Amino acid sequence: MIQRFSFGHPFPTQSVVLSLPAESGPIPFLTPDGSGWQLTLSEQAAVYGLGEMPRGINKRGWHYIANNTDESRHSEDKLSFYGAHNFLLVRDGSTCFGLFVDFPGKVYYDIGYSRHDLLSFHTETPDYDLYLLSGGNENAICREFRTLIGRSYIPPRWAFGLAQSRWGYKTEEDVREVARQYKEHDLPLDMICMDIEYMQDYADFTVNKERFPDLTKLSADLKAQGIRLVPIIDAGVRVDPNDSTCTEGLEKGYFCKKADGTPFVAAVWPGKAYFADFLRPEVREWFGHKYKALTDCGIEGFWNDMNEPSLFYSPERLRAFLNDMAALREKDNIEQEEFFPRVVGGAMGLMNSPADYASFYHEVDGQKVRHDQVHNLYGGSMTRAAGEAFTDLRPGQRTLLYSRSSFIGSHRYGGIWLGDNNSSWAQLLANIQMMPSVQMCGFLYSGADLCGFSSDTTPDLALRWLEFGLLTPLMRNHSAVGTRMQEYYRFPEVLPAVRNMIRLRYALLPYLYSEFMKAALENTSYFRPLAFDYPDDPDAREVEDQLLLGEGLMAAPVYVQNAHGRHVYLPEPMKLLRLRAVDDYDEEILPAGHHYIRCALDEMLLFLRPGHIVPVAQPANNTSELDDASLTLWSFLPDGESAEYRMYRDDGVTTEYEKKEHWKTLQIHHS
């Protein structure tokens, strides 16, 4: 059951697709708490959700702010990351319910932080819709929520192959060399992602003709090898009288404005930039169709970045800071009381300043709306602009699209990656724990920067992260300029194991793709915590580092440096697969309970649940070469029992998802 409660004058976020009447009266489970709400938690209660947020799967014990932020330090003390995903699921004894706070500005959550037995939340202004979902278990409530917010984005099938990316591929030859090296080292590859270096002066929808003289030919040459080019698009439009996107946006009045009606300006990668007012339908249509400059070159996929929006500085704030520094110029000794707040704090405060976010406006139905009041909609609205345009630019075809910033609702138009993480073992664990949370909120096509984006990775971290990343829908190796090059062929000491693991990803695609399509078409889960399927098992409720994957698998990644095994909890008997390659593994049936399982660096652990089948193909160099007509069936069946598996296989490129012939039933009988 879904109930909607409305307060004040909610902003139309368009997060939901169902129109429900507002109810009055008390809200079940909640009591008023000043301007917000609270509920008492028992000692055993668990709270799930909030999507892209720090900390574990169970969010209890910390406080959070839904406030899309360009946060480069992904540490446990942070309160916000790139997405605002205001869905919570509470399990307390036999009580289970979900809450969705539909509000475009800041939402503050205290989940057992100030008081361990109390959950409270409030919005920045008193205008919001609150949805209560009840009457089922965790999986049923998540399914109901996904019905409320609409079908998740479905990418092309080739987007489930490996993507190699780096901020630092500066020329066409750099890109071609990556493709050559992957082929030379016999490593499968489906995508090469291009960062801002392909652009002319970092301006959207342009190509630097000196560095990339013929993007159309480059795209065609790579596509002939089964590899797609995936370029980046940033939110800021370069201030340049010779740039058509800039001049058209100015002429049409399509950029966000300050209070005096002049366009808001802030600096990002191209220097001074304007920002499209994505909350206006006509602006979304205009900006989205700008992608045509690249789809005409044969490009079939994009990633949107810097769209919180990230602001390096505004000219006004930079000028004030420099004037303040000039006042300190003649001082021989700057006391720490001045140095830290004025110099360090002043410099750090230039970027993503709350004052800047409060200084420009959107136009909504002819009315001015201050940006900070609807801030969390911006990145998702950019995704929507592109997603809607692709239906015109590439009719009937799927286009790959994923974004850094997001809001519930934008999951219908694209996926997400989990932002600028770092190369650390802690970030590998964070990746594991964040996946079920973002997928609860509809972002099925999601993944982290494998190996880590910032700082230098190591061969063992690269391999262990791959052993989990090969299970995530978006499987992308991405890193920052100035860090160690981390293409998978650069680790000779672990290269055979890396090759086996990438090939294992491709072999598992009949299962992984089927489970993704079930989740998208039937509003079920791809990743989920053990607690969702075993709610009455107190040990399962406390597992934070194992995930159920679709119907039949459980993953237990190794995420500790130098570890050669790990503890695993099995809520029921399962078949262990200790995999070194798709055709090289040990299997063992283990009873329910706690186990310590050895796992060498070149091995990964998967567990087959009883009564289930996992179809496995022969590995391929890319998804277009994958032959899933001849399959091996992994299974865990008691003697004399049989099982079925619904496998999904379509053309992988058109939007005709729902044809019955896409489904094939596989059967096995264990005699």
Residue ranges and their predicted role:
Residues 1-159, 166-167, 172, 179-184, ...:
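Catalytic and substrate-binding clefts that recognize carbohydrates or anionic sugar/phosphate headgroups
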Residues 31, 41, 91, 100-103, ...:
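Glycine-rich, histidine-containing beta strand-loop boundary motifs that form or position
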Residues 64-65, 81-84, 176, 284, ...:
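Short, hydrophobic/amphipathic alpha-helical packing segments
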Residues 75, 377, 383-399, 405-416, ...:
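Catalytic core of carbohydrate-active enzymes
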Residues 77-78, 152-155, 165-219:
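A conserved hydrophobic secondary-structure block that centers on an alpha-helix together
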Residues 82-86, 94-96, 104, 127, ...:
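Extracellular structured ligand-interaction cores
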Residues 87, 145, 182, 222, ...:
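A residue-level signal for conserved active-site and pocket-lining positions in enzyme catalytic cores
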Residues 188-498, 534:
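Aromatic- and carboxylate-enriched substrate-binding clefts and catalytic-loop regions
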